[in-house]
Amino acid sequence: MGQKTHPIGFRLGVIKEWPSKWYAPKKEYSKLLHEDLKIKNYIKERYKVAGVSKVEIERIVDKVRVKIHTARPAIVIGRRGQEVENLKKTLEKMLPGKEITISVVEVRVPELDAQLVAQDIATQIERRVSHRRAMKRAIDNALKAGAKGVKVQVKGRIGGAELARKEWFLVGRMPLQTLRADIDYGFATAYTKYGILSVKVWIYKGDVLNGR
């Protein structure tokens, strides 16, 4: 069961926080959900080179608070905060009548952020770096940064093979069924001339004993 369950979704409300925090009547729920997806996809597309790990959204009545976690906050903020102001104006056009607040959080150790690691591996594969080399390098960097365990998986027509297959490496522990285990998960897609490869990364950082 633990192999098939999303590592973050499995721990929501236990040691992980929801990426979107708001309440809405049943009739408006789907509308707000699509707005959230639109905001997140737009920000990730706009700041591809900034290493955006995740985007959190909190709604209180007509106020929308957007928190961007990125490895390169200077790119998102811009010179004298001009870029983040431009982003705010764009989001206000996307969500008319809403008061937008944007905060930028720096990911201080990107080697321990599963989403950023997955994106980096996918980028290297697209640049024709050996997938095994990229996977092993990511694992080494994560372990040096303090990870207790790392698992990396690449799936698809690896190296242009006729049949799709998956390859994975696991170093250290990966207690997927332990709720208190702080496991980060990331997914990215690599677009190659042979087709699409999926990259999945699990990083075990240790146990959380005092809840969130």
UniProtKB/Swiss-Prot annotation:
Q: Which GO terms describe its biological process?
A: translation
The record places domain KH type-2 at 39-108
Which GO cellular component terms are attached?
A: cytosolic small ribosomal subunit
Q: Is Iron-sulfur among this UniProt entry's keywords? A: no
SUPFAM superfamilies, per this entry?
A: Prokaryotic type KH domain (KH-domain type II) (SSF54814), Ribosomal protein S3 C-terminal domain (SSF54821)
Record protein name field: Small ribosomal subunit protein uS3
Highest taxon in the source lineage: Bacteria
- Keywords annotated in UniProt: Ribonucleoprotein, Ribosomal protein, RNA-binding, rRNA-binding
What CDD domains does the entry give? KH-II_30S_S3
**UniProt KW GTP-binding keyword:** no
Cite the SMART domains for this sequence: KH
One Pfam family in the UniProt entry: KH_2
How does it associate, per the subunit comment? Part of the 30S ribosomal subunit. Forms a tight complex with proteins S10 and S14.
Which species does this protein come from? Aquifex aeolicus (strain VF5)
Q: Which family does it belong to?
A: Belongs to the universal ribosomal protein uS3 family.
Question: Listed GO molecular functions?
Answer: mRNA binding; rRNA binding; structural constituent of ribosome
Role noted for this protein: Binds the lower part of the 30S subunit head. Binds mRNA in the 70S ribosome, positioning it for translation.
Q: Which residues form a coiled coil?
A: none
Query: Sorted alphabetically, which InterPro entries does this protein's record hold?
Result: KH_dom, KH_dom-like_a/b, KH_dom_type_2, KH_sf_prok-type, Ribosomal_S3_C_sf, Ribosomal_uS3_bac-typ, Ribosomal_uS3_C, Ribosomal_uS3_CS
